[in-house]
Amino acid sequence: MFKNVCKDLKHDVLLYYIFVDNKTTSPWTEYDIQSTVDSVKVAIRWLEEQARKNNVPLKIKSDYYIGPEFTTVNRNLPQPSVQKSVTEPNLKTGLKNINMWADAIAKRVGTTLNIAAKDGIPDVKNPKNKERLIAYLRDTYQVESVALIFMVNNYFKNDISIQINTFNTEDVEFAVVSYKYPAEIAHNFLHLYGAADMYETAFRRNDSKIDQLQKLFPNEIMMEPYARKLTGLEISDYTQYLIGWKNDYNPAYESLFTDRAYNF
């Protein structure tokens, strides 16, 4: 729980998202951008309402990067899709490549934000470009916790959204989100604070555990979010423990906090 830049999901946090165009996704039109902004607002309202229901103080600020004259950042994915970018030729190399892709985008954004040389970044050797951008955002928005999301427009394609660097402390965590549904955005936002998938993904593969989770939590936001409406979904006590809203958990869940090499 609480790794890197996405710390405690309480009090003031920032959701910052960047629209990215590339040659294999649909272009971001002004309509697409505005409808995504609207979806983010819906997702935030739902998340804050879930927090209130569970007596958790939470205020999510949000903002996004857009260039002059409504221009996006152009940066091709390492492979033709998000899924292939992360998994080919293997997961280890794919994750390295998607981190380089995100750093290049953050660097480009940073050049337009006038990020100073001394902006409060941690004193670490060779800080990544994502780190510098997030340090700037922390200072500008006066928050400790920043959820960084790269939005790609895969609305008419079959692809995935994915969280990166949530299983290590070597780099800042971020998400690549393919779809503008509010549930998709809320789902991936929660990933950055420690929430775990409850369906088959790159990080969740055990069929038996997936079956158990689906029986226990059929209305959970961390189930497959594609095209689902937020109405009727919930943040289960299992997920609340992972994101820090609860200090303990039902012992019956013990085996469900691991999946092969991953500890959630």
Q: What are these language model-derived features?
A:
Residues 1-140:
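Propeptide-to-catalytic entry region of secreted or membrane-anchored zinc metalloproteases
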Residues 181-198:
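Active-site recognition of the HExxH zinc-binding catalytic motif
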Residues 119-167:
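Auxiliary, metal-adjacent structural segments of Zn-dependent hydrolase domains
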Residues 18-22, 150-155, 179-180, 224-226:
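Active-site-proximal beta-strand/loop segments in catalytic clefts of secreted hydrolases
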Residues 24-28, 158-160, 229-235:
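Short, solvent-exposed loop/turn elements at domain surfaces
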Residues 11-16, 142-148, 170-173:
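Loop/turn elements at helix/coil->beta-strand transitions in domains of secreted/extracellular proteins
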Residues 167-186:
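Short pre-active-site segment immediately N-terminal to the catalytic Zn-binding motif
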